[in-house]
Amino acid sequence: MDLYPEENTQSEQSQNSENNMQIFKSENSDGFSSDLMISNDQLKNISKTQLTLEKEKIFKMPNVLSQVMKKAFSRKNEILYCVSTKELSVDIHDATGKVYLPLITKEEINKRLSSLKPEVRKTMSMVHLGAVKILLKAQFRNGIDTPIKIALIDDRINSRRDCLLGAAKGNLAYGKFMFTVYPKFGISLNTQRLNQTLSLIHDFENKNLMNKGDKVMTITYVVGYALTNSHHSIDYQSNATIELEDVFQEIGNVQQSEFCTIQNDECNWAIDIAQNKALLGAKTKTQIGNNLQIGNSASSSNTENELARVSQNIDLLKNKLKEICGE
C-alpha cells in the first residue's frame, strides 16, 4: 500500500531487501515527512550491536544503519530569495490612519512560485520575512509642518500591543522620511490571513492641508523575503528591529516591538491600530478606533511645546545637512 500518493507530493521510497528496511519520504506545500521502517529480524541484529559514546561523535551506529538513517532524514534545502518594491501615491483621504496597506500578498507570492520548476514549487511551504524599508515622500513644497505617524503590524495577532512590529513618527517638512523594520520570522504559505501579516498604517496629522482627491505623498517600500521548503532554512542577521535612516533621526523617533525607552523628547504619541481596517483605496466605513500609546503616557505636552520641539529638530537637521554639504 502506497502511504504517500505521487499526486501533489514529492515522494521517495527505497527498500533494502537484504536488510528489510524501507524509507518513505514526502514533501509538499503542507510540509515534510519521513518514515523509516525496519523489520523485526533486522532490528534484533541492530540491537545486538554495541553503541559507544565518543567525544567527537555522540552516537556511533553500524555503517548500514547510519547510511539508511542519513538517507531517510535528509532533504534538500530549497531557498528562493526575493526582493519586492512598489510605489504608490496616497490620497489625503486615505492618509488618516483608517486604512491599511498590505506589503506582501498571496498573489505576489504565487506569481513568484509560478516561475519555479513544478517539482520545486510544490515543496515550497514557508515565507521568511527579513526586512522592510519604507520611504515616504511629500507631494508638496518643503517647509510645511506635516507630522506623520506610521505603524507596521501583524494584523493576524489579536492583541493590539503584541501585533506591533514597529512604529515611527516623523515630519515631512523636509520632503521625505524613511525607516527600516526587520520582522525576522517565518510563516506558512497556507496561513489564512497572509495578506495581513505586514500591514502598514499611516496617519497624516495635517488633515486640512488638502482636499479629498488630492495626492499628499508617495509611499515607496521594499520587502526582502525568502520562500523556502522549511521553517528552519533561514538565519537572520542581528539587525535592530526597527531603525531610522541616519539623516532623518533628527526629526523623528521610533518604537521597537519590545517597547524600549526612546531617547527623544518627542516620544509620547499614539496611533490607531484597530483591527479590520479597510484596504487602501477601498471604501471606508465607520469603525471604533484603538489607539496604541507609544512611549510613556505619564508625560504629555501641549500643542505649542510639540511644535517648538518639531521646529528645534528641523533646525538640527538643517545644521546637520550643512555639515554634510560642507557649508
UniProtKB/Swiss-Prot annotation:
Chain segments annotated as coiled-coil in the UniProt record: 297-327
Tree of life domain: Viruses
Entry GO terms, CC: host cell plasmodesma
Main location (coarse class): host cell
Annotated InterPro entries: Caulimoviridae_Movement, Viral_movement
Keywords: Coiled coil, Host cell junction, Host-virus interaction, Transport, Viral movement protein
BP GO annotations: transport of virus in host, cell to cell
Subcellular location: Host cell junction, Host plasmodesma
Subunit record text: Homotrimer, through the coiled-coil domain. Interacts with VAP. May interact (via N-terminus) with host prenylated Rab acceptor protein 1D (PRA1D).
Protein's job: Transports viral genome to neighboring plant cells directly through plasmosdesmata, without any budding. The movement protein allows efficient cell to cell propagation, by bypassing the host cell wall barrier. Acts by forming tubules structures that increase the size exclusion limit (SEL) of plasmodesmata, thereby allowing viral ribonucleocapsids to spread directly to neighboring cells.
Family stated for the protein in its record: Belongs to the caulimoviridae movement protein family.
Protein name per Swiss-Prot or TrEMBL: Movement protein
Species this protein is from: Cauliflower mosaic virus (strain Strasbourg) (CaMV)
Phylogenetic placement of the source organism: Viruses, Riboviria, Pararnavirae, Artverviricota, Revtraviricetes
